[in-house]
Amino acid sequence: VLVTEGYAAHYATHPRYQEELSKLFNANLVFVEYRYFGESMPKPCNWDYLTVENSLYDLHHVTTTLKQLYDEKWIATGISKGGQTTMFYRTYFPDDVDISVPYVAPLNQSLEDGRHEPFIANKVSTPENRKRVENFQLEVLKRKSRLLPMFEKYCSDKGYTFRIPIAEVYDFNVLEYSFALWQWGTPVNKIPETNADDHTLFKHFIAICEPDYFSEQSPYPSFNAVSYTHLRAH
């Protein structure tokens, strides 16, 4: 099983790490970190070589090399951006592996896709659950004058800096909240009631939607680079 990781591979070094397909088939596991992530960040960094095509040639090189040792069936698999990589790998090198199994792999139609917002607003979960999420977002906006100082202090304590005013970051974080909640599968019953105190609301808000995503210290510079320059074209 070849895992086409879309990000860093550090978590796969844990002794107890197991990937679903290798466990099901009792198969050998090869875990490939995406270039420019984790330990695969070059120094000095030249972003010109961070392309989808180059990442697929990385996988091709790994697979063709290891096939000299392992000549049985091969499965490529990945999750999210890694799932995208599984699909792209199959497209570029259709004969490298026998089976491709992408999980939750988005296929972007453009830089701004446009399908996410209607889905979150009208289709995900139940109308009652969607309303509870929306009510929380509205409450956090209504209390902005009281919660914004807490938000600003939190970001300052974390050392976050932004290229836009902190009040706008707050608003973006509120908008991001619904996507983050559904993405990570947070139970709706974990959302505080709208009459909860400021501290309770703020604690939940930050736990679900960490503002480092918008900061200049974003932990995903490589993701931002490849998403803007290459993934939008696929």
Where are these regions (language model features)?
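Short glycine-enriched nucleophile-adjacent loop
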Residues: 83-94
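Alpha/beta-hydrolase fold nucleophile elbow
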Residues: 70-79
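A catalytic-pocket lid/entrance helix-loop region that shapes and gates access to the active site
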Residues: 97-148
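Conserved small/polar residues in nucleotide/adenosyl-binding loops
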Residues: 229-234
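Short beta-strand element of the alpha/beta-hydrolase
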Residues: 1-6
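Conserved alpha/beta-hydrolase
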Residues: 22-39
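The serine-hydrolase catalytic nucleophile loop
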Residues: 11-18
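Alpha/beta-hydrolase active-site loop
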Residues: 49-67
